[in-house]
Amino acid sequence: MTAKKNYLISFVILLIICGSIKNSFATHISQPVLIDPKTHFTVGDTVVLSGWVEYNAQPAPDVLLNFKLIRSDGSLVANQSYPSNQKGHFEFKFDTKNELPGSYQFTVTSHCLEIHRYACTYKNQTLSIQLSNP
């Protein structure tokens, strides 16, 4: 009788462990969505790119985002991180008055909520920007 009891308890514990492992491999998928991004600017303009963080087809507040702006030669112009606001929206601003004309690559990456960081997929959106002389 004791052996049957031990087997039953072991089987229940095994089921609990297997159920926990399945959930531990779930990923948190949030992604940045740019809203009507402008791609052409003039030297001296302020680049303003806005959007929202989508999670389960809803805006997600307090999701850490990383914003990178890179010149065509690969040099880094801007590297900033901050969370989406309470409505799940974000805005990136960059002053171009000291920049050279040319192509730039803007990338915004979702780093997920702090509590989901262990299972984050780090989705991003990339946009090519042209900066021209006035």
What are these regions (language model features)?
Residues 41, 55-62:
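A short beta-turn/strand-edge loop motif at beta-sheet boundaries
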Residues 56, 93-101:
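Short, surface-exposed loop/turn segments at beta-strand-coil junctions that are enriched for proline
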Residues 100-121:
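Enriched for extracellular/lumenal, surface-exposed ectodomains of secreted and cell-surface proteins
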Residues 114-134:
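Short beta-strand elements
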Residues 48-56:
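Short edge beta-strand/loop segments characteristic of extracellular beta-sandwich folds
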Residues 83-94:
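Glycine-centered loop-to-beta-strand initiation motif
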Residues 23-47, 132-134:
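Short, compositionally biased P/S/T/A/G/V-rich stretches that sit at domain boundaries
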